[in-house]
């Protein structure tokens, strides 16, 4: 006779605060927040949210958290809501505030871990709406390795100007166009008033929507939950079912790392490549994999990207936004096509307790529409929308969003700036010319600190009509909404003595996308000796912050090639 299989403990940690004589004080505290005698036998579910009133990205999370809690109650659990921070990249762009964007990812992960560990919660539903809050939540889920479900707030609807869709990126580009005399200040004002018609994250395939798509592909979100807009009441249904799902995961004994496996990360990269997603996905997936104890490296992105075509005709480079993806069936449509082509791991487990293939079989999504998302035999590009570069200027790697490139090779003359502001001043003064390579350094994870996004300068370059004629390279990052010829995440960064620290005005820089190379060449005789002379007596710029969160961050953050992690 076989031994009966033991059932998973649905209260793997909350017994520490609910069971036994010694927990009288803890139970007393819990009674004060509404728990009764019968509730102490239920699993306690943390409902962690980055809701705030600062940015439209997160406005719907308060409503969705209520629906999650109803779902937890309906499934037999007890929800306990708590909050964490979120930084709006759109508001913090182009000034000192952007130093704090990437570090917010770590603060979010650390704060969720702190609450979940301290209060002995059994599982979590984690809700987020803005760029860094999505990976921050998923990093926390992987680190804790409890039953966990991620829920996205949803994206905003596009605004309208003269019958044309506009998003927040149009505002950044309008600034450059206005400075170049191409449009009036009144036209900028019209765009400004239209770009955010309501709640939700920025609508293109920028960082938030890329990471929401990744959350679905990696199996941490319910199938079909990434694409519906924030205002769509289907999101309340997904929220309710997410609350039910986490309790079901506890009953099955399924934890985050059983879902966030090597195969799941490869699925996530595949979907990001097919959509032409944000370069920030590279940083965030590397960081998430580290928390999940998955050996993912920057080179895996090229390996997978070689096999996956770029299919999404999506902003910032394409025509469409996430709402259009929703209209054609959402991310399951993309995953089904990729699965049928043998490009995804169908046996990867998901938060439904079923595999990715089982979920897609139940949903039976329609075929690709061949406009918003191209069919595989008619791709926009034959390989994925993100490429990792190496070479003399980036020995550890750099990232380029090839989804927007027409030509595979660009060679130009270096114009070197220590920080974004100096580059913006030069552009406004008309000092940036076609075939220049704008080099912005000391903006890396440690040297920035915080690896600021360069959307203000890239938007201004495009608005000035130089988007296809000027290459911008940096040890900082780019927004998911960045367009133009841009290479970021150059590693080693300048403050660590990477080659970018020794580039000078007049050097020739070549970007060769086809061969995945980023090279620097000193012009003139004795070029090699001149390069070595530049290193003599070199010292990095002094730290900009020595106290506070950025002072601590700069001391411990690792290379962008490893995800800019801090642990």
From Swiss-Prot:
Keywords from the UniProt entry: 2Fe-2S, Amino-acid biosynthesis, Branched-chain amino acid biosynthesis, Iron, Iron-sulfur, Lyase, Magnesium, Metal-binding
Enzyme class, broadest EC rank: lyase
SUPFAM superfamilies listed in its UniProt record: IlvD/EDD N-terminal domain-like, LeuD/IlvD-like
Active site residues per record: 479
Residues the record lists as binding [2Fe-2S] cluster: 57, 130, 202
NCBIfam families assigned: ilvD (TIGR00110), PRK00911.1 (NF002068)
Family classification: Belongs to the IlvD/Edd family.
Protein name from the UniProt record: Dihydroxy-acid dehydratase
């Amino acid at each position: 006779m076989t031994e009966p299989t033991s059932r998973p403990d649905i209260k793997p940690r909350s017994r520490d605060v609910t069971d036994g004589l010694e927990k009288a004080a803890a139970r007393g505290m819990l009674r004060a927040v509404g728990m009764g005698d019968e509730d102490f036998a239920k699993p306690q579910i943390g409902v962690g949210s980055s809701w705030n009133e600062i940015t439209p990205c997160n406005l719907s999370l308060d409503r969705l958290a209520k629906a999650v809690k109803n779902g937890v109650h309906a499934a037999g659990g007890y929800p306990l809501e708590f909050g964490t921070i979120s930084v709006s990249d759109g508001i913090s762009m182009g000034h000192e505030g952007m130093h704090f964007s990437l570090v917010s990812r770590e603060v979010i992960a650390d704060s969720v871990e702190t609450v979940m560990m301290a209060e002995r919660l059994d599982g979590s539903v984690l809700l987020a709406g803005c760029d860094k809050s999505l990976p921050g939540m998923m990093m926390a889920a992987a680190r804790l390795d409890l039953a966990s479900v991620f829920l996205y707030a949803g994206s905003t609807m596009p605004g309208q100007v003269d019958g044309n869709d506009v998003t927040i990126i149009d505002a950044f580009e309008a600034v450059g166009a206005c400075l170049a005399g191409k449009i009036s200040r009144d036209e900028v004002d019209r765009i400004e008033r239209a770009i955010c018609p309501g709640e939700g994250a920025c609508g293109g395939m920028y960082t938030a929507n890329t990471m929401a798509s990744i959350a679905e592909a990696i199996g941490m979100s319910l199938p079909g939950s990434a694409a519906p807009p924030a205002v769509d009441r289907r999101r309340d249904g997904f929220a309710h079912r997410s609350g039910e799902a986490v309790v079901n995961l506890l009953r099955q004994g399924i934890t985050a790392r059983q879902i966030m496996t090597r195969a799941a990360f490869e699925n996530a990269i595949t979907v990001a490549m097919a959509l032409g997603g944000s370069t920030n996905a590279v940083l965030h997936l590397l960081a998430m994999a580290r928390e999940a104890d998955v050996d993912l490296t920057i080179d895996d992105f090229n390996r997978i990207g070689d096999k996956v075509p770029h299919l999404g005709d999506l902003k910032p480079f394409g025509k469409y936004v996430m709402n259009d993806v929703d209209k054609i069936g959402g991310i399951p449509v993309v995953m089904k096509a990729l699965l049928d082509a043998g490009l995804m791991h169908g046996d990867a487990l998901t938060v439904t307790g079923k595999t990715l293939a089982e979920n897609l079989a139940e949903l039976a999504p329609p075929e690709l529409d061949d406009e918003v998302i191209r069919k595989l035999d008619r791709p926009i590009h034959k390989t994925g929308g993100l490429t990792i570069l190496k070479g003399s200027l980036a020995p550890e790697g750099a990232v380029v969003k090839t989804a927007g490139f027409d030509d595979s090779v660009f060679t130009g003359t270096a114009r070197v700036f220590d920080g974004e502001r100096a580059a913006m001043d030069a552009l406004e003064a008309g000092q940036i010319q076609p075939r220049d390579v704008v080099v912005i350094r000391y903006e890396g994870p440690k040297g920035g600190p915080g690896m600021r996004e360069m959307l203000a300068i890239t938007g201004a370059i495009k608005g000035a009509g130089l988007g296809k004629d000027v290459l911008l390279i940096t040890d900082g990052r780019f927004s998911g909404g960045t367009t133009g010829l841009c290479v970021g995440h150059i590693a080693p960064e300048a403050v660590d003595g990477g080659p970018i620290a020794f580039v000078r005005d007049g050097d020739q820089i070549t970007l060769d996308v086809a061969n995945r190379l980023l090279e620097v060449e000193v012009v003139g005789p004795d070029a090699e000796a001149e390069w070595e002379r530049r290193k003599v007596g070199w010292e990095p710029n002094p730290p900009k912050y020595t106290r506070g969160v950025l002072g601590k961050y700069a001391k411990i953050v690792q290379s962008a090639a490893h995800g800019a992690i801090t642990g």
